[in-house]
Curated annotation (Swiss-Prot):
Modification Phosphoserine occurs at: 31, 33, 293, 302, 657, 664, 671, 678, 682
Crosslinked positions (Glycyl lysine isopeptide (Lys-Gly) (interchain with G-Cter in SUMO2)): 166, 175, 287, 311, 315, 327, 419, 473, 484, 495, 528, 752
Phosphothreonine modifications at: 680
Pfam (any one): zf-C2H2
Protein name: Zinc finger E-box-binding homeobox 1
DNA-binding residue intervals: 559-618
Zinc finger (C2H2-type): 150-173, 180-202, 220-242, 248-272, 882-904, 910-932, 938-959
Gene: Zeb1
Cross-link (Glycyl lysine isopeptide (Lys-Gly) (interchain with G-Cter in SUMO)): 327, 752
Amino acid sequence: MADGPRCKRRKQANPRRNNVTNYNTVVEANSDSDDEDKLHIVEEESITDAADCEGGMPDDELPADQTVLPGGSDRGGGAKNCWQDNVKDNECDSDAENEQNHDPNVEEFLQQQDTAVIYPEAPEEDQRQGTPEASSHDENGTPDAFSQLLTCPYCDRGYKRFTSLKEHIKYRHEKNEDNFSCSLCSYTFAYRTQLERHMTSHKSGREQRHVTQSGGNRKFKCTECGKAFKYKHHLKEHLRIHSGEKPYECPNCKKRFSHSGSYSSHISSKKCISLMPVNGRPRSGLKTSQCSSPSLSTSPGSPTRPQIRQKIENKPLQEPLSVNQIKTEPVDYEFKPIVVASGINCSTPLQNGVFSSGGQLQATSSPQGVVQAVVLPTVGLVSPISINLSDIQNVLKVAVDGNVIRQVLETNQASLASKEQEAVSASPIQQGGHSVISAISLPLVDQDGTTKIIINYSLEQPSQLQVVPQNLKKEIPAPTNSCKSEKLPEDLTVKSETDKSFEGARDDSTCLLCEDCPGDLNALPELKHYDPECPAQPPPPAPATEKPESSASSAGNGDLSPSQPPLKNLLSLLKAYYALNAQPSTEELSKIADSVNLPLDGVKKWFEKMQAGQIPGQSPDPPSPGTGSVNIPTKTDEQPQPADGNEPQEDSTRGQSPVKIRSSPVLPVGSAMNGSRSCTSSPSPLNLCSARNPQGYSCVAEGAQEEPQVEPLDLSLPKQQGELLERSTVSSVYQNSVYSVQEEPLNLSCAKKEPQKDSCVTDSEPVVNVVPPSANPINIAIPTVTAQLPTIVAIADQNSVPCLRALAANKQTILIPQVAYTYSATVSPAVQEPPVKVIQPNGNQDERQDTSSEGVSTVEDQNDSDSTPPKKKTRKTENGMYACDLCDKIFQKSSSLLRHKYEHTGKRPHECGICRKAFKHKHHLIEHMRLHSGEKPYQCDKCGKRFSHSGSYSQHMNHRYSYCKRGAEDRDAMEQEDAGPEVLPEVLATEHVGARASPSQADSDERESLTREEDEDSEKEEEEEDKEMEELQEGKECENPQGEEEEEEEEEEEEEEEEEEEVEADEAEHEAAAKTDGTVEVGAAQQAGSLEQKASESEMESESESEQLSEEKTNEA
């Protein structure tokens, strides 16, 4: 029996009985060893096994041209029809018919010899085209020309020899107690897993494509299409295909994606980067949403309860952002102007969630702008996040009596107008207290895991809003360009009844940067608010406004520049630099001094003190919570001059250094300024530290910090402000304070500060760092709040304040609860500062801030664990559910909420300890770790190849019909067994060579398989690229919903295993390396073998020559 070439079978569509008179004359195309019967391998994965098996049709209903074997009732439907018709309704015969025909047939076939009974066939050839014999295939999909000769009566599978048919019936159709039978057809299996895989053949082609060996483990099934997934988040992303939801939008080309993997790959490809306009991204043509929220309280006596999770119609879901996108995207979006429309209810139509008024900031028709809710732009991380500014207002009310935010968030227009009439109209600054949100930045994930957003707003006159330059791309504080030094004096101060009590009590505190600034203020029990009926002259400021004569513009000996950042930030930066390099060189010191805007000598002295251990990790002047102290940081030895209400001219000479006041009941600072200033303003954060003091309530007016001030003013508030703020508030301060000249954003950080060492506040007290509002961005940090605002969620740990990171003057932050988004803001041309390299957004630096002194938390410690988050980080709803602060999703478990947060932050918390790769989900890390351990739990039952990753295995199983082959050894063994004893001598003769060559042959087969996989991956990538290009040409929205669904499904299939493909690539590299080593070893072995053979041949030749010589000598003798 001669074997022809493999896979070269001759197609004989309709063999006749007279054509096959001699069975042995037929040229066999292949041996039956390819059938998996003897190896107990599932057949249905190569063909359908006639799974439809239209149960035991009566013989009279059989087609006339059917080939029938004894005792068998054949089926009418063929394998080809099974695939085309996707399982007909009358698939299987009844169990009774199976029982009638089953056992006797098995017995008969098993007892028969190799004599086949072949019945004549009808001559009609047309009717044979659909029969299973004519269309049956072997396991590789090749048509079997001889399948009609010996057909299984149960499954219509054809065989060339009767022994193969007997084996097939024995292993597939003989029932016993140990076997597992298919309920839809008569197949039996030795293992349950084989039966489960066989059941997939009864499914439609669409469903079968997604079912792999682990199909039994896919418990999350789609109710729409029947797809099943192993993990719930894969099902959630898949469901977006049916719902049409596309929460991920490319910020450049505005293409939207339903799957995060598709979005990430689109962003990383950067194909659409050239489509971005030069001066910002237009938002035209996109869907507009309506943003509305309840009106804010018009008086501090009725604060609105914060409701962070306010639902906004048509608000898309959140989206994660890739690390690269987080680093690069925000730069030019941050400067997009946003003008807030006015109105009591503020139902401002948004273009895709952005208050937009074109390239230039314009004043609205109303004299007072009102903001109730801000929807962050649909860029990258959020899409969009709704920030209810009333929540921020209520938080700030606790800290600063609500006056700062009321300037922007006051909703009662009538109340504003009446108060404006009461105010003195001599100052034109008071007339146009218009609030403009200049920019809302893109969220950014910081290196410690927190995410940060900036909301920039300014209080400007409508006339000034018109002169803002058009080029906002490089100027974040857009209104700052119009802020000149000719501002009229602020009429806003808060007078105290006991002014003298402040004047004599500044003697026991020192500056944090130097040791020359004494000062301590005794607390005042109550406040006297500014009377709006006062004349328009600069009123006498409160004693707390005393500042040293260290202004860089007025006093020549001032060491602090006008662009001096806040004191706390300076210390944080210096300590960060010190942590990086404790002994910097002179050049490095000069760079550090430039970055923090301090004199080189001062920085040098500070480093020397740190090296000498003179500067502890905490503030050098920790006053007790009940006592007040004033820290006036300055580099001069001059004593601050007390402010006199009758000497307004002294205000121009007052220093612009930080005034840090820590006292329980403390008066706000209010100082008047002469109208003409010789220099532009500089950042002057106002630091308010809330302290627990039963003595009374201290009100801090936003107007307290005036234009000439440069340094932070730290005031402390008592714990009882929530109750007392209703009684004691500065009613008209918000009108008079227009800080249009200041360069530093308002920094409001209300963080859970258990042992905050810099501010020296008692445990569990919220610390509020308030920088007076300016025309520049305002930074608000609200990670933790007091018990008065239970709905604001804490992000800080007990001993850390992540929002109080070291931020230079050009770093802007607003920390929304559980989110912290930071940006490097471009400073005004008047005050240019080099960017600080210590804190790079989402940077890869390994250094951390000094957590003991600066309260910087390592948020990874909290977020990286899969355990339940701390109670401070989560808040339960009334039903005991866990709600996300940034979107409307609610979760039953806190761990689910924690993992959901990764979608907002883009963080990958599960990191491999060997190669440092990070993954969002833990099971992805587990599969990745198998690469390092070498574990390969998944094995193909057809070719025997093993896989360490389920995605690689699934891909192999789904596409193996075209290339999956048994190993070379198995194939040779099966062919030798079929060939019989006549080829045994040849096998024995070539056994040694074959054993030596088989490893290389196996390696070549593996390389071929790997090459096929790589080719398929490259083809997939090319197809995906073609699809994306076609979609870009077709437009933003696909008009064909069906095509879009298919496209999204393909994208989902492609991206569902995005991280898995990374692991596959690593696995392929490992295999390639192993194969290379194996090939080298085989080659070396072959070379060594050839050398041995040559040596043996030479020895044999020498021996033969010696024998010949000996024989010749013998003959001669």
